[in-house]
Amino acid sequence: MTESGNGIVNTRQPKLFLDVPDMTSEAKKTYAELDVCTYTPKNLGDSKHEFMECDCFEEFRDGLNHACGEDSDCINRATLIECVNGLCKHSCGTDCQNQRFQKKAYADISVFKTERKGFGVRANSDIEPHNFIYEYIGEVIQEEEFRNRMVKYDQMGFKHFYFMMLQTGQFIDATLKGCIARFCNHSCNPNAYVNKWVVNGKLKMGIFANRHISKGEEVTFDYNVDRYGANAQPCYCEEPNCIGFLGGKTQTDAASLLPQSFADALGIRPSMEKKWINMMKAKGEKIAKSDTTTVNVDFVNSLSLEPCTKTEDVNRVMSVLLQIDDAFIAEKLLERITLTEDEAMHYQFIKLHGYLIFSRLITMFEDKPDIIWKILNFLLVLPKTTKNGIIHSGIDKKVEQLKNTPKFEVICEDLLEKWSKYETYTRISKKDISENSKVIDLRRIRLPIGWEIIHENGRPVYYNAQRQIKQANPPTDSAYRSNSSHNLSGVSDPKSRSATPSSNTSRYSGSVKYIPTPTYGQMQQKRTLSPEEYEKRKKSRIEWEQKELELRKLMEQETLKAKLDQETQKKSELERIIEEANKQKELERLQKLKQQQEDEERKKVKKQASHVNAIENKWVKFFAQHVPNLIKNYQKDVGKDVLKESARNIVKSLAQKELKKDSSRSPPEELSKEKRAKVKTFSMQYMDRLVAKMKEKKEKKR
């Protein structure tokens, strides 16, 4: 019985290859051996961020530095970064335990010849869960060269390709140059997984044990995540959950939907992937595998993310964010962070270079104000610590810049004011440890949540910034201890998401029953026939089962297609009805809008006319006070009635002249002398013309 990394117990005994000859020497003749990866150009594989020291201390015993070990709470180890001699001089010193890639601390493995898969890799001794097995070494190339080599190797007739995606646009090619890790075969139920570490400024890819691996057992991992080949190939892993094919552009049913480290960081369980894949199958939709990314965006978008509840959850999230350049995954991980309300987890976020990560996220999402707002809000709720991490990350300067944006001004001011009250301290050094080791070994103290060891007045002091407590002796508050309800010393241990072995029941309902592949022990018990006859019957049975499976799949596909066509037709009809209704609704809206605009225009014209008429009436009244007196002497010439009519005409003409000059101006309270003279002249000219016309008319009658 073996237990996988995700805690699932596999009752199927692993197959051992103890008596198969060692073929390592022969296998190495098929490629050029490399001790380290080569990079063309040299900047490929570079980490995008500067190296960060851990906060461990040297721990020499028996001539060996035990710092940063498997059971330590080393920040670098938890975030998949190796410590480097010369760069950790103020912390863990030289040759600590977190240098497995650099020291080539490989597991004892060898190459052997498999029955159907060519060469394979087996364990020469037991390997414990999450132990480092081997670095995947090869030529690191750009995407354009990767595509050229894919075509080239296919034309050369190569059956096996050895491409692994290191990061976006960069690939490790171990086809012609590499190491024996290239011979690790695929399995649908693997005992190892691939993870990426930052080692001395370069991103490295390593193979790690997913569960206990017994001596003689083949070492396998899932190709369907980071490994690339030209065409899909038959799978010969013989696992109960085998899907039949691996590689190619289209993912198979059990293909991983995103890299192991991303899945662990997002809190994705195997059942979640399986449920989504089954749902896609039911819809008759293929799960496409992109050439440019290892993340299935549709699957990730379908997830309902959960907050971090354990230290290892935080470790996984922060280790990915330290390396990631994928904004899509970064946004999803940020969502998981902001959902977390547990203060113990908040302290762990801060501890694992939290302020540095949030500083990078602000830069990554500088053109997305909604995400920036989320980051600032989360920073505001983080508990108080020392100011060292804030200053080192430079996040205070970025918040200062964001303050110039009106939307962020208030929250940035609140955040900067909060940080201004934090204190900066010199952390305890190795010299301080040496001087105080006679009294107490500071390296072995497991501090409660929120506590730090700082240097004050030449002596180590225990400090809790949130509670504003300093004391000379180690804190003993059990309610805040890291090893009580929350294990803050946990190290990120990626878990396997491979499907578990199926039970001996039919995989499908109906008349056709699928018989699972027998276990290795069952096959041993049935070998009463000769090997030749046994193999013949086995081949025949497999062929029959394959045909039955293909027939069943074909029937399922036809049923699903018919159902999908019917649903598509219903959907199209519904969309047509909705479209017609929307068109009618839009037409009514436009007509109503047009009517409103016409009504508004009429009101506007009427209002303007009303305003002009009011002003005109004021001018008429104004001139009516003066014109009759100016022309009263003409009554003897034209008569009383004609004089009144003439006065009205003169007043109206004068009012029209004023409106033409300015239709909004009202008349003055009094008529000025200059204006009176002009009005008098106009009025008398009008009357003189009228008198002349009347005299001319009388003379014609005579």
Swiss-Prot record:
PROSITE patterns for the chain: AWS, POST_SET, SAM_MT43_SET2_1, SET
Ranges where the SET domain occurs: 107-224
Record domain AWS: where: 49-105
Segments passing through the bilayer: none
GO biological process: methylation; regulation of DNA-templated transcription
Keywords associated with the record: Chromosome, Coiled coil, Methyltransferase, Nucleus, Repressor, S-adenosyl-L-methionine, Transcription, Transcription regulation, Transferase
Class of this enzyme: transferase
Annotated spans, Disordered: 472-541, 656-678
InterPro entries recorded: AWS_dom (IPR006560), Post-SET_dom (IPR003616), Set2_fungi (IPR025788), SET2_Histone-Lys_MeTrsfase (IPR050777), SET_dom (IPR001214), SET_dom_sf (IPR046341), SETD2/Set2_SET (IPR044437), SRI (IPR013257)
Residue intervals of the Post-SET domain: 231-247
Coiled coil: 554-611
Catalyzed reactions: L-lysyl(36)-[histone H3] + 3 S-adenosyl-L-methionine = N(6),N(6),N(6)-trimethyl-L-lysyl(36)-[histone H3] + 3 S-adenosyl-L-homocysteine + 3 H(+)
Biased composition regions of type Polar residues, renumbered to the chain: 472-490, 497-509, 519-528
Biased composition (Basic and acidic residues): 529-541, 656-674
EC code: 2.1.1.359
One Pfam family this sequence matches: SRI
Cellular location(s): Nucleus; Chromosome
WW domain residues: 445-477
Domain notes: The AWS and SET domains are necessary for transcription repression.
Purpose of the protein: Histone methyltransferase that trimethylates histone H3 'Lys-36' forming H3K36me3. Involved in transcription elongation as well as in transcription repression.
Family affiliation: Belongs to the class V-like SAM-binding methyltransferase superfamily. Histone-lysine methyltransferase family. SET2 subfamily.
Protein name: Histone-lysine N-methyltransferase, H3 lysine-36 specific
